[in-house]
């Protein structure tokens, strides 16, 4: 996925996808442990719910990406996981939500949203 890292484009990708993870690398080739864990947690839960995919955006693809994302989301770390248009946090928070069962509830809600 390639774009100009404007607030409008960041908002658009979040609005158009039920699940988005902004990460270092890709789910298949993560470039940091936190991004790998975040993608793995989201992938496990999505698979369990029969969802085929989620959107991922590689913040290493452009030198402007990390600062633009952090400024837009007002969240200091990468990865950043968005579900149903809302920032839920990074990999630690995604893992906590997975372990508590709350992630399943979040993904089950409004299952007809854009995927």
Regions found by a protein language model. Name each.
Residues 1-11:
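Flexible, polar/low-complexity N-terminal or interdomain linker segments that lie immediately upstream
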Residues 25, 48-66:
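Thiol-based oxidoreductase modules, predominantly thioredoxin-like and allied folds used
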Residues 10-51:
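Local sequence-structure signature of Cys/Sec-based thiol-disulfide redox active-site neighborhoods
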Residues 83-115:
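Non-catalytic, surface beta->alpha helical segment in thiol-disulfide oxidoreductase systems
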Residues 70-77:
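Thiol/disulfide oxidoreductase modules built on the thioredoxin-like
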Residues 20-22, 55-56, 82:
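Beta-strand cores of modular interaction/reader domains in eukaryotic scaffold and signaling proteins
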């Amino acid at each position: 996925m390639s774009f100009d890292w404007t607030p409008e484009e960041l908002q658009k990708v979040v609005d158009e996808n039920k699940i988005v993870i902004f990460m270092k690398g890709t789910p298949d080739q993560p470039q940091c442990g936190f991004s790998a864990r975040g993608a793995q947690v989201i992938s496990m839960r999505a698979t369990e719910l029969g969802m085929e995919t989620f959107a991922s955006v590689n913040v290493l693809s452009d030198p402007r990406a990390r600062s633009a994302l952090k400024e837009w989301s007002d969240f200091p770390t990468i990865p950043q996981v968005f579900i149903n248009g809302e920032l839920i946090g990074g990999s630690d928070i995604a893992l906590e939500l997975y372990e508590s069962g709350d992630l399943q509830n979040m993904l089950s809600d409004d299952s007809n949203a854009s995927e």
